[in-house]
Amino acid sequence: MKKVVVGLSGGVDSSTAAAILHNQGYEVIGLTLWLMKGKGQCCSEGMIDAAYICEQLGIPHEVVDMRDVFQTHIVDYLVTGYGAGITPLPCSQCNKTVKFGPMVQYASEKLGCDRIATGHYARIRYDEATGRYQLLRAVDRNKDQSYFLYDLSQDLLAASLFPLGEMEKADTRRIATEHGLKTADKPESQDLCLVESNGSMRAFLDKYIAPKKGDIVDTAGKVLGQHDGVHHYTIGQRKGLGIAAPEPLYVVELDAVHNKVVVGDRTKATQEECTVNRVNWVSIAEPSTPIRAAVQIRYRSAPEPVTVIPLENSRVRLVFDEPQFSITPGQAAVWYDGNKVLGGGIIEQFSK
């Protein structure tokens, strides 16, 4: 019998993925990662629901303590980034370093299993012509999570299954209901796990970064107001600046060194190109010449036509056909050919 370890968060998606694979004849082992430090996190609602689902399905349930890894790779990563004036994207980092990598290792070393599965909405396809595993958008475009999975290596893609990739979200709920799963009607998470457990990103960051007052200035250096911490702002932000101006002003730069928030009109927050580092080429090998693609510079943004120019040291330059508003350092840029993820990386801070 084929064996698979399913990552269970306690939500409907991962629960249904486990049920589907169980029905397909897999020997399924549920695995929950204990991520958060703090009182009550060892018996959080998600962990309790995951255990209940395993009991319903009659499968084993393992819990792995990943709190120190999560602290290093996610909490410290976020705090360092925000403190330096960037807006990190924790989810892609978490998928690679906290979830998929450790899950594959644990499954292999502790459970004698070479396949894992999750409830992500994405698809994996092996291309015999190139010998590469390709990452594709999910059938349900509205739920597609390929943007957050761009950093998975070929080895991790080869070991992973996404049972929900060919399904609509409504089908997931229906299957969960048909199986009588406790999580069938469970609401979806609406924010980052850290935000949900702390109330807001501001509250989370203020636990680690002491608010420090400074100037809000325009691009000419004129003081327009005061802020209470650079880490409370992000590129492109308009609301909550607390300044009066005859025209809309947006955050165009976060100067953590001089503790300044720089604002300007919309044109100042618009760029024709950017550079990206820590690039991972997914469905194709790294090209030696520029390629055409469609890029997303944030999760819910529409793909925009772009020329991807390879640089040295796992970097690329993105030249947009049309100038883009609010390109945010620290966020992921992921480029596609249709539904196929070609590659992605982290947007760099702009050089002056």
From Swiss-Prot:
HAMAP family linked: tRNA_thiouridyl_MnmA (MF_00144)
GO biological process, one term: tRNA wobble position uridine thiolation
Organism lineage string: Bacteria, Bacillati, Cyanobacteriota, Cyanophyceae, Nostocales
SUPFAM superfamilies: Adenine nucleotide alpha hydrolases-like
Annotated CDD domains: MnmA_TRMU-like
Main location: cytoplasm
Pfam families: tRNA_Me_trans (PF03054), tRNA_Me_trans_C (PF20258), tRNA_Me_trans_M (PF20259)
Protein name (record): tRNA-specific 2-thiouridylase MnmA
Catalytic class of the enzyme: transferase
Family of this protein: Belongs to the MnmA/TRMU family.
Gene Ontology CC terms, in alphabetical order: cytoplasm
Documented EC number(s): 2.8.1.13
InterPro entries according to UniProt: MnmA-like, MnmA-like_C, MnmA-like_central, MnmA-like_central_sf, Rossmann-like_a/b/a_fold
Segments of this protein annotated with the region Interaction with tRNA: 143-145, 298-299
Residue numbers annotated as active site: C94, C193
Function noted in UniProt: Catalyzes the 2-thiolation of uridine at the wobble position (U34) of tRNA, leading to the formation of s(2)U34.
Site (Interaction with tRNA): H120, Q331
Annotated catalysed reactions: S-sulfanyl-L-cysteinyl-[protein] + uridine(34) in tRNA + AH2 + ATP = 2-thiouridine(34) in tRNA + L-cysteinyl-[protein] + A + AMP + diphosphate + H(+)
Keywords in alphabetical order: ATP-binding, Cytoplasm, Disulfide bond, Nucleotide-binding, RNA-binding, Transferase, tRNA processing, tRNA-binding
Cystine bridges: C94-C193
Keyword Transferase: yes
Listed GO MF terms: ATP binding; tRNA binding; tRNA-uridine 2-sulfurtransferase activity
List of residues binding ATP: G7, L8, S9, G10, G11, V12, D13, S14, L33, G119
